[in-house]
């Protein structure tokens, strides 16, 4: 297999010839060509050369500068954040390099304990580690209750000069409902302290398929044909 990742490099006007040449090389060596993680424009370039396109899911990206809890659509989130703040929870935002090394063992223990016995099912783009000295530019978001106990944490990896992508999300079973939403909202509010403007909240695989399944009242088994229908399309 010849697996490409992302859009072709260079001038978009040259993408067509780049894809054509790549497919020619793949045929010469008997490789099955495939691409993952392309934009709409990139998908069109590959489709124009005869490749099929499958939508695998959606990436939720927040414009931190424009993020607001106002408006009717944000009412559930706004209520959750108010509830958590009334419970006395405070949120701290800092780069990993600003964390005292003595704090990391406790943070790592909490993250592992809150995961429980469930296996780690992270994404291929996830670091799979927490507190490594090499990750100093990562962003740590912590929620601390009125007694000073840690009840939630998020870790984001750098994404370009002013972005961050969610890498780890953990909350205590005893944390008030809405603590995760509160951490995200507070990170947007404190964005300038860590120089962020965009936040990726990670990737939802087959979101449209499962949304359609919910609309149709489909259970896990009856959703499968819907998934395959989308794959064939």
Where are each of the predicted segments found?
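Soluble catalytic regions of membrane-associated enzymes that act on cell-envelope
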Residues: 1-74, 78, 187
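Conserved small/polar residues in nucleotide/adenosyl-binding loops
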Residues: 229-233
């Amino acid at each position: 297999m010849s697996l490409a990742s992302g859009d072709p490099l260079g001038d978009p006007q040259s993408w067509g010839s780049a894809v054509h040449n790549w497919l020619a090389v793949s045929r010469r060596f008997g490789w099955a060509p495939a691409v993952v993680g392309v934009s709409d424009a990139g998908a069109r370039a590959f489709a124009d050369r005869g490749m099929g396109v499958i939508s695998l899911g959606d990436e939720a990206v927040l414009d931190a500068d424009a993020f607001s809890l106002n408006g009717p659509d944000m009412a559930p989130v706004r209520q959750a954040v108010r509830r958590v703040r009334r419970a006395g929870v405070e949120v701290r935002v800092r780069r990993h390099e600003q964390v005292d090394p003595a704090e990391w063992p406790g943070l790592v223990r909490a993250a592992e304990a809150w995961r429980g016995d469930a296996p780690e099912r992270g994404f291929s783009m996830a670091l799979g580690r927490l507190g490594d000295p090499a990750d100093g530019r990562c962003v740590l978001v912590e929620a601390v209750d009125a007694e000073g106990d840690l009840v939630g944490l998020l870790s984001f990896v750098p994404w370009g000069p002013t972005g961050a992508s969610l890498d780890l999300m953990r909350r205590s079973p005893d944390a008030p409902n809405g603590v995760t939403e509160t951490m995200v909202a507070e990170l947007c509010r404190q964005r300038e302290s860590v120089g962020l403007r965009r936040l990726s909240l990670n990737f939802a695989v087959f979101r449209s398929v499962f949304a359609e399944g919910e609309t149709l009242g489909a259970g896990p088994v009856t959703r499968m044909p819907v998934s395959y229908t989308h794959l064939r399309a």
